[in-house]
UniProtKB/Swiss-Prot annotation:
The gene is mutS. GO terms for biological process: mismatch repair. ATP binds at G607, P608, N609, M610, S611, G612, K613, S614. Keywords: ATP-binding, DNA damage, DNA repair, DNA-binding, Nucleotide-binding. This is DNA mismatch repair protein MutS. This protein is involved in the repair of mismatches in DNA. It is possible that it carries out the mismatch recognition step. This protein has a weak ATPase activity. Pfam families: MutS_I, MutS_II, MutS_III, MutS_IV, MutS_V. Residues 832-851 are annotated as: Disordered. GO terms for molecular function: ATP binding; ATP-dependent DNA damage sensor activity; damaged DNA binding; mismatched DNA binding. GO terms for cellular component: cytosol. Coiled coil: none annotated. InterPro entries: DNA_mismatch_repair_MutS, DNA_mismatch_repair_MutS-lik_N, DNA_mismatch_repair_MutS/MSH, DNA_mismatch_repair_MutS_C, DNA_mismatch_repair_MutS_clamp, DNA_mismatch_repair_MutS_core, DNA_mismatch_repair_MutS_N, DNA_mismatch_repair_MutS_sf.
Length: 890
């Protein structure tokens, strides 16, 4: 390092402590970057890469950005997942001996950004800290530095459970200890794009102990300690706005895994990853930024306590029924700014006068809001506003201290009102009247000298002066004027009287600016005292905002209040998919019932593509989520149970990036549901098994249906193109066939989008191809092939019968197979009975059990012993292939 100049040596010394961040190194009016930082930053920011002499034999790569524009460049880097260490000059270069002393004053990371375009006003910016313990449990602590919110929870499940919780927070950065498993980190970052940071300290930092008074578990305290230590290390400033840590338990909320949330498009769409087109987009009628954030949090964690859900529903009903109360509340909420983030800016010391003016305008609305809610005959409302302080003394303080239109900068003066401070008023009097005196002096000097062009001016170098053109110099009386500056066409003078007034005026103006700054910083400290009250008030207003939002959208979209039942029954009359209906924008939407009594667990849904099967399935899930966050639902009548979990496999969002095919994703999501679902869960499976061959897919689909029906008992919607599976209705007493209806007119299919009882009578695959405008010649050929195939092969679907333990041979049922594209083994027994899937008649021939040889019986015995739930899809396929080869050997 000794070969470098002292300044570069200083840079390298600072950089050594921030290897994982860009170092913005302050040099005068620029932030400079050197070496690898410069090369990478020039590429990422699209700025010029240059070089400079640093004392070594080779020039050093360098790039820089102006300090006044640095905020924009920092945001660009952080938005891409990088960290930025801001290194400032901490002493005056004029008085410095040698190299100016510099220190990192803040480390800006994706999880600690306070403001900027990366921070959506209606979204939290959570930083997560994860701690792993020897017993296999985890503790997850989260902090939103912009609002001061802190949460912690204990997780005892798998990495998938952690993934769910981190996804629910929307964290862009996660803090772990340096020994954390790299494999587990990879699992997290494969699904969620996050910046990984490290912090080994877990003791609660001094001065923050009061924030964990309600936390007793050592594991939770360690996670919070890791989080707080990282925040302190990166921010290096006041954290007075941090709120007491809230403990929550994941078993208090409905579980919806990451893939299901994406499939259902709860907060963003699958295709664009944007809010528009999601359920959140539809429900968000909030008027405040903090209300918008709370709404998203509610949607990420629907409730499972019936009483809490009903409390919310009753409040929503109150707002729905009282139009004037609702509209008056909305008008007041429009005037409320982001109290949570304003409190954060106060604590961080970067609040300006306009921010405090916004705070005052917000507080002016609070008394009327609290009074209106207090008049409601509602226990939930009374409990909600209990302890809420309107902070009227703060409103009064801000009202008499801050000007109505203050500048953005707090160093330019013109912030504090007249009458707030006596000394400031005196200085302003001198400044204002001093300038008046200057104008009067100019008039008097003109009269005395008779020089009409004489003028008094001012500049920063020479101060006040009397300027006289050279043509008029002879008119000046001798001895009274002292020459100050000579110009080409004029001379500038000063008098003793002007000197005296100049001193008074300039001192007053300087003192005004400094005193206003001092008064403002003192005022800011006074406001800090109110931070806890402001944060409590923010929560009250946020909750009211979400509830009125539910009421507003329920009124506008004609939603109905759901009735919650402790029974395992679903009764939805004229249900609609809320987002699809909204996007149709007035066009006809076909509503559908979903009626599943306690003794009906599985709907097996058939019907052509594009007919609405997936929409119907998503519709039920969204109605359930809406109900359990406390919102009315899109139906004319709804009776719903409280579900503990939702599992879905809808759509074809393959995980190709991580090397997983459609079929693998299907199997993993099916495994997740089978392993974790309870009879209080909701399962939605759309065409499970389509990612493999017909026989394999059909076998797996049937096995999954039977397992859910027999072992789990969860309410399930299972759509399929394997029409042969509809015979399961005969053997599974809690399964019912339903289909999406369609009709054929003049050779064209018309989708009716109506769910009806029974199985579909036709597939309409070629008709869908026609709608997609495939070439006519191709369509014609497909019809020829279909006609040939329809009369060929038959598939034996094992019919479920009650058997004793030693019996291994199922009773077969034969059904006609749809076209397949693989070579299959023909059924030898031509005398087996025929079950026509598309018709209603069934052969009355007696079905004889097939005679199996010893080898076939042995294979069946092996199949019976296989534990499919304990195998991966690949292992299952390999085992199936091995058994097939065994049967084919002569």
């Amino acid at each position: 390092m000794t070969q470098y100049t002292p300044m570069i040596q200083q840079y390298l010394k600072v950089k050594a402590d921030y290897q994982d961040a860009f170092l913005f190194f302050r040099l005068g009016d620029f932030y400079e970057m050197f070496f690898e930082d410069a090369v990478k930053a020039a590429h990422e920011l699209e700025i010029t890469l240059t070089s400079r002499d640093g004392g070594s034999s080779e020039r050093i790569p360098m790039c820089g950005v102006p300090y006044h524009a640095a905020k924009n460049y920092i945001e660009q880097l952080v938005e891409k997942g990088y960290k930025v260490a801001v290194c400032e000059q901490v002493e005056d270069p004029k008085t410095a001996k040698g190299v100016v002393r510099r220190e990192v004053v803040q480390l800006i990371t994706p999880g600690t950004m306070m403001e900027g375009r990366t921070i959506d006003e209606k979204e939290n910016n959570f930083l997560a800290a994860l701690t792993h313990f020897e017993d296999g449990s985890y503790a997850l602590a989260c902090n939103d530095l912009t609002t001061g919110q802190n949460t912690v929870t204990l997780l005892t499940g798998s990495v998938e459970d952690i993934l769910l919780e981190v996804y629910a927070t929307g964290s862009k950065e996660i803090v772990v200890d340096s020994s954390f498993s790299k494999d587990e980190l990879n699992k997290l970052t494969e699904t969620l794009k996050m910046t990984i940071s490290y912090e080994d300290a877990t003791a609660i930092p001094e001065g923050l102990e009061h924030l964990v008074k309600n936390v007793s578990q050592a594991k939770l305290i360690k996670a919070v300690g890791r989080l707080f230590n990282y925040v302190i290390r990166t921010q290096k400033r006041s954290l007075d706005h941090l709120q007491p840590v809230e403990i929550y338990y994941t078993n208090q909320f409905m579980k919806i895994d990451v893939h299901s949330k994406r499939n259902l498009e709860l907060t963003e769409t699958l295709r664009t990853k944007e809010k528009t087109g999601s359920l959140l987009w539809l429900l968000d009628k909030t008027k405040t930024a903090m209300g918008g954030r709370m709404l998203k949090q509610w949607m990420e964690r629907p409730l499972i306590q019936k009483e809490r859900i009903e409390e919310r529903l009753e409040m929503v009903e109150t707002f729905v029924n009282d139009y004037f109360l609702r509209e008056d509340l909305k008008e007041k909420l429009k005037e409320v700014y982001d109290l949570e983030r304003l409190a954060g800016k106060v604590a961080f010391g970067n609040v300006n006068a306009r921010d405090l003016l916004q705070l005052r305008r917000s507080l002016l609305q609070v008394p009327a809001i609290l009074e209106a809610i207090s008049l409601l005959d509602n226990a939930y409302a009374a409990r909600l506003i209990q302890g809420a302080d309107p902070c009227e003394s703060l409103t009064e303080l801000l009202g008499r201290s801050i000007q109505e239109n203050p500048p953005l900068s707090i160093k330019d003066g013109d912030i504090i009102k007249d009458g707030y401070n006596d000394k400031l008023d005196q200085y302003r009097y001198v400044s204002k009247n001093g300038k008046t005196w200057i104008a009067e002096l100019e008039k008097r000097e003109r009269d005395i000298t008779g020089i009409k062009s004489l003028k008094i001016g001012y500049n920063r170098i020479f101060g006040y002066y009397i300027e006289v053109t050279k043509a008029n110099l002879g008119a000046l009386p001798e001895g009274r004027y002292e020459r100050k500056q000579t110009l080409a066409n004029a001379e500038r003078f000063i008098t003793d009287e002007l000197k005296e007034k100049e001193t008074l005026i300039l001192e007053a103006e300087e003192k005004i600016v400094q005193l206003e700054y001092d008064l403002f910083t003192a005022l800011r400290e006074e406001v800090k005292v109110f931070i806890p009250k402001l944060q409590h008030l923010a929560k009250v207003i946020s909750e009211l905002d979400v509830l009125q939002s539910f009421a507003t959208v329920s009124e506008e979209e004609q939603f109905v209040k759901p009735v919650l039942t402790t029974k395992r029954e679903i009764f939805i009359k004229d249900g609609r998919h809320p987002v699809v209906e909204k996007v149709l924008n007035g066009k006809l939407y076909v509503p559908n019932d979903c009626i599943m009594p306690e003794n009906m667990d599985v709907f097996l849904i058939t019907g052509p593509n594009m007919s609405g099967k997936s929409t119907y399935m998503r519709q039920l899930a969204l109605v359930t989520v809406m109900s359990q966050i406390g919102c009315f639902v899109p139906a004319t009548e709804a009776v719903l149970p409280v579900f503990d979990q939702i599992f879905t496999r809808i759509g074809a969002a393959d995980d190709l990036i991580s090397g997983q095919s459609t079929f693998m994703v299907e199997m993993l999501e099916a495994k997740n549901a089978i392993a974790n679902a309870s009879e209080r869960s909701l399962i939605l499976f759309d065409e499970i098994g389509r990612g493999t061959s017909t026989y394999d897919g059909m076998a797996l689909a049937q096995a999954i249906i039977e397992h859910i029906h027999d072992q789990i008992g969860a309410k399930t919607l299972f759509s399929t193109h394997y029409h042969e599976l509809t015979v399961l209705e005969d053997s599974l007493d809690q399964l019912k066939n339903v289909h999406v209806s369609a009709i054929e007119e003049n050779g064209k299919v018309v989708f009716l989008h109506k769910i009806q009882d029974g199985a579909a009578d036709k597939s309409y695959g070629i008709h869908v191809a026609q709608l997609a405008e495939l070439p006519d010649s191709l369509i014609a050929r497909a019809k020829e092939v279909l006609a040939q195939l329809e009369g060929q092969e038959e598939i034996v679907i094992p019919k479920r019968v009650e058997v004793k333990e030693q019996e291994v041979i199922p009773e077969p049922v034969v059904v006609k197979e749809e076209p397949v594209a693989i070579e299959e083994t023909k059924v030898d027994n031509e005398e087996e009975s025929q079950l026509s899937f598309f018709g209603t008649e069934q052969s009355s021939k007696k079905q004889d059990k097939p005679v199996l040889d010893a080898k076939e019986t042995a294979v069946l015995t092996q199949i019976k012993k296989i534990d499919l739930l304990d195998m991966t899809p690949l292992e299952a396929m390999n085992e199936l292939y091995r058994l097939q080869k065994k049967l084919k050997k002569g």
